[in-house]
Amino acid sequence: MRSIASSKRVCTHCLSHSRLFSTTVQHRAQPSSDAVPSSPPRSGYARLTNRGLISITGVDSTTFLQGLITQNMLVANDPSRATRRTGTYTAFLNSQGRVLNDAFIYPMPKGDGETATTDDPAWLVEVDKNEVSSLLKHLKKHKLRSKLKLRALEDGERTVWSSWKDHSEPRWAAYNLESESSSPFSPSSSVAGCIDTRAPGFGSRLVTPGEEDLRVHLPDEAQVAGSEVDLGTYTVRRMLHGIAEGQAEIIRESALPLECNMDMMRGVDFRKGCYVGQELTIRTHHTGVVRKRIVPVQLYAKSPLPSGETPVYDPTAAVALPPSGSNISKVDGRKGRSAGKFLGGVGNIGLALCRLEIMTDIVLTGEGSQSSPEQEFKISWSAPEEASSDTTEPAEVKVKALVPPWLREYISSGARNLARKVDSQEGHRAKELLYQLEEEEEQRRNE
């Protein structure tokens, strides 16, 4: 009998129209559990009971999704514009370019009952389980006269899994996601899946029929390694890799895809055509600087400032967990703009949307970083309304932002490209100024 960490869910509708760096702090309750999640094993798999599925079937389903998501539904650089054969990480945006839902999209397996009698394209959309009805409403709003059917799958119809193996060299997908050999499943298989590209070596995402154990469908040890772990342990592993997931962490109609690292996670195709919310995303990618990004954070009390580039999870650590949405500020106490927002956590680790040049040593522009190695940051919050003010004092915990090596490399390469672009622009302006001065000098000589 599997053990799944129980959690309290709160509606985030009241947060959907507020900016993450507003001066008014809106706290969201953190999931609570009687049992502290264990440290994730080097290999294993987890049943993701917090994820839901929507099926989209019909002749227009591919074109329909192509106009709504950040990823490309067609094979890149294919002159015949063939439909992609693999699943992918992606996002649905609103017209202002803010995230509605993070999602995975998979081709419907041919062995599935919904596609067994037709050659029409069909897709499975995996999304935060609490957001299925909201996304379904969004899809129906854009359906218009498209020839397709939308349906939310019932509990037990299919199960979403995360599976990972120990890799001596953490890296991106070992095979080309667009190649014919990218899918390990036979054409008649009822299993859907894809490489989870959100972090190097993070593993695979799989969708199986029914509620049976993953090994029933994939008995080969080469495909599934280790033992099943609970949802809480998967969450710890996800946060250690700096991956935000669901609208408790990627706030609906507030979060921006690049601030959520969706560009690095291969969730955005900057070469594809128009889709809802494309304008701001493309403009930021080509001309802007992403000053805030979601990174893993280490929570600590009075212990020394943690060292290292990645957080360390300690199930025995006695650290108070801040409410989601809490402001991060400098320990020195001087008032100033927020350095970041705490999004959620487990034990002594979590995720936060951080101003990189304040909370880390990353340099984004020629202005340099504003951070100091000795600078500490804190999260302070008041007692819950239901708690007695006579017995509960305001809580506080220290926090350190840690940029994983792969994210640091990605950001640095973008900064270098931006610097080269700026240098090129400055060079052109310098040449134009030189030509202008030469013309003015020539005119003075002729006078």
UniProtKB/Swiss-Prot annotation:
UniProt KW keywords: Mitochondrion, Transit peptide
UniProt-annotated stretches for the region Disordered: 367-396
Gene Ontology MF terms: transferase activity
Presequence range in chain numbering: 1-28
GO CC entries: mitochondrial matrix
Compartments in which it is found: Mitochondrion matrix
UniProt entry tagged with the keyword Mitochondrion: yes
Primary localization class, coarse: mitochondrion
Pfam families: Beta-barrel_CAF17_C
Single biological process term from Gene Ontology: iron-sulfur cluster assembly
InterPro entries given in the database record: TrmE/GcvT_dom1, YgfZ/GcvT, YgfZ/GcvT_CS
Protein family membership: Belongs to the GcvT family. CAF17/IBA57 subfamily.
Record protein name field: Iron-sulfur cluster assembly factor IBA57 homolog, mitochondrial
Protein species of origin: Neosartorya fischeri (strain ATCC 1020 / DSM 3700 / CBS 544.65 / FGSC A1164 / JCM 1740 / NRRL 181 / WB 181) (Aspergillus fischerianus)
